[in-house]
Amino acid sequence: MKPYADASFIVALYLQQESSKAATAFMQRHGEPLPFTPWHRLEVRNAIRLSVFHGLIDASQSKSQLKQLDVDLQDETLLVHTPIDWVAVLREAENLGAGKSETLGCRSGDLFHVAAAVELGCDQFLTFDERQKKMAKAAGLLVKI
């Protein structure tokens, strides 16, 4: 299996959440780093920063987790920088949206992650977002979380 994780899954590896135990358990079983695109970089890092705004963590915890994210990317233990054809991803996202957004209610960001998974040739999709799970299944991806 070649998994692709959205930001909800990756953030659960860095911030203590209800879903953290499931995310950590998957990574221990899987044992391979997950693709990490520039879109992930923006979304994951911003989610960690927003946790300070929402009072879930303090600024020092945010700084520590952002540093750990960078270490993990450098070590390629959990995540690996992954180049991607953004034009192809946007086209795939539009195709997915045209076929399913009216019935599944997916947002553009949801479509973007599913399209990226398809473009990277992944066959498994990791998310804690219910709408995204439905879209990933509709795109033919196995949803395990």
Where in this protein do the model-derived segments appear?
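Metal-dependent nucleic-acid phosphoesterase active-site entry motif
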Residues: 1-21, 46
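Glycine-rich nucleotide phosphate-binding loop and flanking beta-alpha elements
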Residues: 11, 132-133
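Conserved SAM-binding loop
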Residues: 106, 125-126
